């Protein structure tokens, strides 16, 4: 029996009650008299998350998130799926099962995300059907290939049909989509979107029946702009390990209240709303629901005192109470990047100057813009211009085909050195940004030797964070990974970076489904026109 002030997410009122638990579920809730200082609320649900972005395997993620009140998450494992296919999804499900946290998964709908890049796997409609029938899979994952949906592509529509035939939701991904095209997209069966960046976008999509997720992660932080727009869910999407140490859904709730969202509404956005949409048994304190709840000090600060899952205490004042198992060992995915001459990173041009397209990054946003710049040409090679903050960027196919594409990027601020990563959404090829090709190649070689991860290089010095699980995740705990990641960011700042999250920003330069100008292993890509762009032909 647990007693206290409870928040009823059905009615929105708070009253003293005792909760009777039997067999891991709530048996009865009885109103009582008494004065209680704390508030008992349902455990938090992160309704849209890519665990891989934390660089932690699910069992390590759970140990870090549960003390912050997160009892459940709906994870789209399309990062590891792009590297390892269905085997990668199975690894995530198996490792998640070793924790008390209730992980649910969506079947990755876009593996690969587009046909304009090289990925490590392909999941067809038949593979989607197989995944949707797994017990912990609750939806079809975000349908990023919105042009194919709008065009009625047979393969894409077969995946959507597989989910709808099983009465499962289909998550969306429709940045800046509007008008008739948005109507076609929603009419195909897409029910959610987490890519909104303005109140006007939220309003249009909600009017058409979409449920909107306000995203507040480590790279994309849209909650402040969307707080007054009337969103349905609060989600993290992508969260770094250092940020996870500071908070998860509890921190997002604090920000939501700071930005003007009613506290009870905010709690509903991370409990009953996602529970009802995805058909979960957690998310409310009522008979028949899972006995998953959090004791907090107030509905403003959301300081988590205790966490219960299935009626059992799992965290107390920030301390995880469950002894961690060794997790599930994943087969490593080696980096198949053949050795290459450094000249392959160069961009050739005739004359003394070249006019080029440049990717312009926006700090805290996944959307990029396109700039046009005139750069010097020396010995037939187009040069970076650190005085204008225009650096080189290259993407190297990591799956053995030998593709290398190069371009230019603005906004990183590096004055020396290079940074590189095998975390490069969504195909997770190897991406590198730098001042000169020699150091860029050195960064690539270090990652090849490490088996994947993140690296920053300057002269003879470097910092590396190894990510041996598919080149995406560590099998260490959050403290170890956060410390290594913090060292990398500090070193990168010393190289001149002015971004709040340079590695996260770099990892999205190759995401060919978020506007506007991106780069994959086959070249520059115009997301809105959904086509490869020539670097120098305007």
From Swiss-Prot:
Keyword Hydrolase recorded: yes
GO molecular function, one term: adenine deaminase activity
CDD domains for this protein: AdeC (cd01295)
Alphabetical keyword list: Hydrolase, Manganese
Pfam families per the UniProt record, alphabetical: Adenine_deam_C (PF13382), Amidohydro_1 (PF01979)
Cofactor: Mn(2+)
Biological process per Gene Ontology, one example term: adenine catabolic process
InterPro entries: Adenine_deam (IPR006679), Adenine_deam_C (IPR026912), Amidohydro-rel (IPR006680), Metal-dep_hydrolase_composite (IPR011059), Metal_Hydrolase (IPR032466)
Top enzyme class: hydrolase
Reaction equations catalysed: adenine + H2O + H(+) = hypoxanthine + NH4(+)
Record flagged with keyword Manganese: yes
EC numbers on record: 3.5.4.2
Family the UniProt entry places it in: Belongs to the metallo-dependent hydrolases superfamily. Adenine deaminase family.
UniProt name for this protein: Adenine deaminase
Species for this entry: Methanothermobacter thermautotrophicus (strain ATCC 29096 / DSM 1053 / JCM 10044 / NBRC 100330 / Delta H)
Gene that encodes it: ade
């Amino acid at each position: 029996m647990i007693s206290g002030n409870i928040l009823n997410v059905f009615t929105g009122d708070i009253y003293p009650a005792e909760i009777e638990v039997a067999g891991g579920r709530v048996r009865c809730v009885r109103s009582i008299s008494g004065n209680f200082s704390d508030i008992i609320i349902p455990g938090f649900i992160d309704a849209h998350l890519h665990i891989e972005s934390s660089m932690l395997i699910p069992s390590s993620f759970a140990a870090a998130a549960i003390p912050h009140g997160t009892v459940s998450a709906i994870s789209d494992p399309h990062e590891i799926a792009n590297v390892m296919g269905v085997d990668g999804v199975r690894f995530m499900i198996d490792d998640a099962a070793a924790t008390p946290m209730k992980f649910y998964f969506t079947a990755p709908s876009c593996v690969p995300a587009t046909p304009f890049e090289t990925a490590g796997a392909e999941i067809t409609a038949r593979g989607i059907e197989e995944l949707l029938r797994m017990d912990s899979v609750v939806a079809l994952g975000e349908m990023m290939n919105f042009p194919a949906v709008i065009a009625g592509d047979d393969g894409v529509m077969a995946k959507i049909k597989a989910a709808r035939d099983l009465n499962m939701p289909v998550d969306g991904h429709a940045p800046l989509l509007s008008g008739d095209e948005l109507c076609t997209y929603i009419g195909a069966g897409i029910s959610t979107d987490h890519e909104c960046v303005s109140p006007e976008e939220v309003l249009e999509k909600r009017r058409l029946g979409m449920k909107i997720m306000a995203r507040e992660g480590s790279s994309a932080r849209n909650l402040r702009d969307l707080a007054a727009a009337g969103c349905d869910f609060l989600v993290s999407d992508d969260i770094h390990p250092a940020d996870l140490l500071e908070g998860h859904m509890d921190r997002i709730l604090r920000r939501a209240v700071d930005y003007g969202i009613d506290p009870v509404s905010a709690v509903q956005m991370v409990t009953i709303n996602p529970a009802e949409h995805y058909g979960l048994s957690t998310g409310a304190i009522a008979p028949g629901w899972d006995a998953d709840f959090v004791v907090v000090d107030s509905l403003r600060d959301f300081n988590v005192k205790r966490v219960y899952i299935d009626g059992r205490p799992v965290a107390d004042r920030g301390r995880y109470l469950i002894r961690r198992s060794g997790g599930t060992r994943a087969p490593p995915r080696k980096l198949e990047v053949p050795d290459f001459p450094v000249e392959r990173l160069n961009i050739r041009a005739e004359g003394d100057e070249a006019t080029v397209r440049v990717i312009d990054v926006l700090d805290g946003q996944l959307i990029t813009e396109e700039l046009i710049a005139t750069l010097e040409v020396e010995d037939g090679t187009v040069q970076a211009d650190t005085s204008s903050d225009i650096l080189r960027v290259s993407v190297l196919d990591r799956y053995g085909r030998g593709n290398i594409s190069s371009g230019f990027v603005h906004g990183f601020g590096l004055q020396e050195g290079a940074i590189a990563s095998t975390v490069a959404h969504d195909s997770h090829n190897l991406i590198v940004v730098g001042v000169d090709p020699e150091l860029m190649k050195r960064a690539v070689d270090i990652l090849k030797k490490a088996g994947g991860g993140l690296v920053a290089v300057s002269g003879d010095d470097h910092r590396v964070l190894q990510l041996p699980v598919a080149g995406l995740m560590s099998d260490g705990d959050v403290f170890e990974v956060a410390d290594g990641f913090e060292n990398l960011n500090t070193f990168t700042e010393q190289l001149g970076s002015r971004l709040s999250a340079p590695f996260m920003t770099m990892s999205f330069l190759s995401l060919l489904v978020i506007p506007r100008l991106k780069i994959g292993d086959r070249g520059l890509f115009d997301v809105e026109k959904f086509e490869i762009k020539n670097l120098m032909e305007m």
